[in-house]
């Protein structure tokens, strides 16, 4: 008769963390890209010469998906229960890593989308606002970077649950 230790479900939590990192980060990137893109399109009607300058929020939003991809790859390469023991601690560490990066990317994408939309529209009417918009976008992008850094730290904690 076998006993259930819970470690059989640990890879589920690890893979859930990888999925959460990618899905939530890409949701933030998609929202930021769509919202900023609408602003660029409507601004391009009034001032077509500013379209390339106003593409910055769209690019910054797109980078958020890459952060989620990085964490998802780090997590998925750390899950190999056949090669070494993978405990619940490891699964929870990977889950929290994915959630930290993914939800930070989602919130950063929402901020970038809203600021980018309003910023490029305002930039069409008052070009002096461009620098302020870029600074706000940088602070919004920093939110996702915080999630990426915490995600890397948390995923590196996996495997430290027991001395082997």
From Swiss-Prot:
The chain crosses the membrane at residues 12-32, 55-75, 95-116, 129-154. The keyword Transport applies. InterPro entries: ATPase_proteolipid_c-like_dom, ATPase_proteolipid_csu, ATPase_proteolipid_su_C_euk, F/V-ATP_Csub_sf. It is a multi-pass membrane protein. Its main location: membrane. Residues 33-54, 117-128 are cytoplasmic. Expressed in leaf, root, flower and silique. GO terms for molecular function: proton-transporting ATPase activity, rotational mechanism. Residues 1-11, 76-94, 155-164 are lumenal. The keyword Nucleotidyltransferase does not apply. Keywords: Hydrogen ion transport, Ion transport, Membrane, Transmembrane, Transmembrane helix, Transport, Vacuole. Coiled coil: none annotated. It is found in: Vacuole membrane. The record marks 141 as: Essential for proton translocation. One of its GO terms (cellular component) is plant-type vacuole. Belongs to the V-ATPase proteolipid subunit family. Proton-conducting pore forming subunit of the membrane integral V0 complex of vacuolar ATPase. V-ATPase is responsible for acidifying a variety of intracellular compartments in eukaryotic cells. V-ATPase is a heteromultimeric enzyme composed of a peripheral catalytic V1 complex (components A to H) attached to an integral membrane V0 proton pore complex (components: a, c, c'', d and e). The proteolipid components c and c'' are present as a hexameric ring that forms the proton-conducting pore. This is V-type proton ATPase subunit c3. The gene is VHA-c3.
């Amino acid at each position: 008769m076998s006993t259930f230790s819970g470690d059989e479900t640990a890879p589920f939590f690890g893979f859930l963390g990888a999925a959460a990192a990618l899905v939530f980060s890409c949701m933030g990137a998609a929202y930021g890209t769509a919202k900023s893109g609408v602003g660029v399109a409507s601004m391009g009607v009034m001032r077509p010469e500013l379209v390339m300058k106003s593409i910055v929020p769209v690019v910054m939003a797109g980078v958020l998906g890459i952060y989620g991809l990085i964490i998802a790859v780090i997590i998925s390469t750390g899950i190999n229960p056949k090669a070494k023991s993978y405990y619940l601690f490891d699964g929870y560490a990977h889950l929290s890593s994915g959630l930290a990066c993914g939800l930070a990317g989602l919130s950063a994408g929402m901020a970038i989308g809203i600021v980018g939309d309003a910023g490029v529209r305002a930039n069409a009417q008052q070009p002096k606002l461009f620098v302020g918009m870029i600074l706000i976008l940088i602070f919004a992008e920093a939110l996702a970077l915080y999630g990426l850094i915490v995600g890397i730290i948390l995923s590196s904690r996996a495997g430290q649950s027991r001395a082997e």
